[in-house]
Amino acid sequence: MDSRARSSSRKTHGRGSRSSSRDDKKSKAGRGNRGRARPDAGAERQSAGRTGTREEHRAPAATVVNVDEVRSPGEEGTEVVALLESERPEEGIKPSGLGACEWLLVLSSLIFIIVTFPFSIWFCIKVVQEYERVIIFRLGHLLPGRAKGPGLFFFLPCLDTYHKVDLRLQTLEIPFHEVVTKDMFIMEIDAVCYYRMENASLLLSSLAHVSKAIQFLVQTTMKRLLAHRSLTEILLERKSIAQDVKVALDSVTCVWGIKVERTEIKDVRLPAGLQHSLAVEAEAQRQAKVRVIAAEGEKAASESLRMAAEILSGTPAAVQLRYLHTLQSLSTDKPSTVVLPLPFDMLNLLSSPSNRAQGSINYPSSPKPVEPLNPKRKDSPML
């Protein structure tokens, strides 16, 4: 009996140990899965971060402005974008590094300057004015950083070359060029453009002939903008047109490191045939206005004369005063003229038959019977 009880207890103990071992294995497997899941989540986070950084690197760093869409000069957004673009490229310039041979040359030149220090320092320092900036090229490579100045700057005489850029306001006259208006008139326009160098590094590294580039750009921009305006608008709205041209130019020249301050239309030259036709039209309009004014004056004068005649007809004393005033004016204007005044009553008598003849209307009277010439004579019985 004891042996049977011991065997049964051993069996139950073995079963319990097996079940506990199985539970331990399951818990370890679950922990392992959790541990595996955690690195997977970390890997996903890392991959997401990498994709985000890649997208940030792939994102464009520059804003592109289409000049053809700049039509309304009152848009302030275009000017703001142009200002931002003009400040960005100077920081974004990345000059290429020097090679091994170039570094050896730089070190040797520095050693030579140090050895001959008291005398060489005068050849390595230059002065830049307040309105100037200096760009240094070392062995053909643009040195990193902003333009030097104002004040002193150091350079290597044998390896460096420097270029000075004037930041003061520049003036450029645009010669006469043909423009076709909206109403198909051909005219010649000249203008003047005021600009300044804003980014010296970008200017020297991107543009060769500043004046020619700005001149051609102003001409093409004016042709494009004035094609949407009539002749009358061009002659009357020069200020708004100049503002439109300035905004359009500034959106392009910001990439070159140039800031356009102002543009003005100086003169508009019309062809001879168009000038003659416009002069004839203007003269006809002036003649029409003169005729209208003369007709209105005659109408007002006739109305005033009619009113004066009505007033004088009601007051005989006023007629006499007018008669005396006329005599006095005749004597003063022409002293050699002798005037014999007649009494006013005689004038009334002389004028009354004429007034009656003019005022009376002779109506046709009824026909009277014709009497024979010899009424006493009788006709013969034969007749």
From Swiss-Prot:
Segments on the Extracellular side according to the record's topology features: 124-383
UniProt keyword annotations, A-Z: Lipoprotein, Membrane, Palmitate, Transmembrane, Transmembrane helix
Basic residues composition bias: residue spans: 7-16
Family: Belongs to the band 7/mec-2 family.
SUPFAM superfamilies, A to Z: Band 7/SPFH domain (SSF117892)
GO cellular component: cell periphery; cell-cell junction; cytoplasmic side of plasma membrane; membrane raft; plasma membrane; protein-containing complex; slit diaphragm
Subunit comment: Interacts with nephrin/NPHS1, KIRRL1 and CD2AP. Interacts with DDN.
Keyword Transmembrane: yes
Example GO biological process: gene expression
Entries under InterPro entries matching the protein: Band-7_stomatin-like (IPR043202), Band_7 (IPR001107), Band_7/SPFH_dom_sf (IPR036013), Stomatin_HflK_fam (IPR001972)
Transmembrane segment boundaries: 103-123
Compositional bias segments (type: Polar residues): 355-365
Topological relation to the membrane, as annotated: Single-pass membrane protein
Domain of life: Eukaryota
Residues covalently joined to lipid (S-palmitoyl cysteine): 101
Bias type Basic and acidic residues, positions: 374-383
Role of this protein: Plays a role in the regulation of glomerular permeability, acting probably as a linker between the plasma membrane and the cytoskeleton.
Organism in which the protein naturally occurs: Rattus norvegicus (Rat)
Topology, Cytoplasmic side: 1-102
Name under which the protein is recorded: Podocin
